[in-house]
From Swiss-Prot:
This is NH(3)-dependent NAD(+) synthetase. Mg(2+) binds at D53, E166. The lineage of its organism: Bacteria, Bacillati, Bacillota, Bacilli, Lactobacillales. Homodimer. SUPFAM superfamilies: Adenine nucleotide alpha hydrolases-like (SSF52402). One of its GO terms (cellular component) is cytoplasm. Catalyzes the ATP-dependent amidation of deamido-NAD to form NAD. Uses ammonia as a nitrogen source. It catalyses: deamido-NAD(+) + NH4(+) + ATP = AMP + diphosphate + NAD(+) + H(+). It comes from Ligilactobacillus salivarius (strain UCC118). Pathway: Cofactor biosynthesis; NAD(+) biosynthesis; NAD(+) from deamido-NAD(+) (ammonia route): step 1/1.
Amino acid sequence: MRPLQERIINELKVKPEINAEEEIRRSVDFLKDYLKKHPFLKALVLGISGGQDSTLAGKLSQMAISELREETGDDAYQFIAVRLPYGDQADEQDAMDAIEFMQADKTVRVNIKQAADAMVQSIEENGLEISDFNKGNIKARERMIAQYGIAGAVSGAVVGTDHAAEAITGFYTKYGDGGADITPLWRLDKRQGRAMLELLNAPEHLYKKVPTADLEEDRPALPDEVALGVTYNDIDDYLEGKEVADNVAEKIENWFLKTEHKRHMPINVYDTFWK
């Protein structure tokens, strides 16, 4: 095993193999324990895209909330699934299929187009140019603003979808989809999350769907694997301690090192990771 590979695996807490049933229970109990420790919190809030990660995180969240209501008799507990399209979303049906699968207590829809466009316009009025890529990050941050607004209105915590295969590459927007209160998928790679959805009898098209952030207008629905230049299968193999081709390992490690700042709170004078 490569030295950096071992360090990454230890940092991200990835197991070479999992028992899907045990990991489902672990995530559900983790969410329940967090809410019980913070009795002022009565809701879990999560943006639903219709992809594998939000489908799994949403199902686990609803399971945790349902169990809490039954165990405590407190009907105030709720899970809120949030649709956050930018205008019209091409895969809207997938998102609705995911919400139906998780049987969300409540669905809220917030179209972020007006807010995102207004932000871009306001910045560009100052003589600055916002690239399409930069605008994509603005969209992601507007989505998180909406989720925290909803969570604030219902005494809730925002659930994140970050997992090991995403964390290793930093393939998320800093303070956008990378910002959340609690991340029940942390420690899992992509294939492990898929195994959990299979066990939960999720609709197959939701976890076999080609992963995409779909933030760029110049390159709509750009597959993650194209953007990264590496497949999730290779990333998962690397995270599980398996041997991958040197050029693949180098690309994964380059992403990890380049995006290290995303896995830290704002840098302070005592931080040394960046030196």
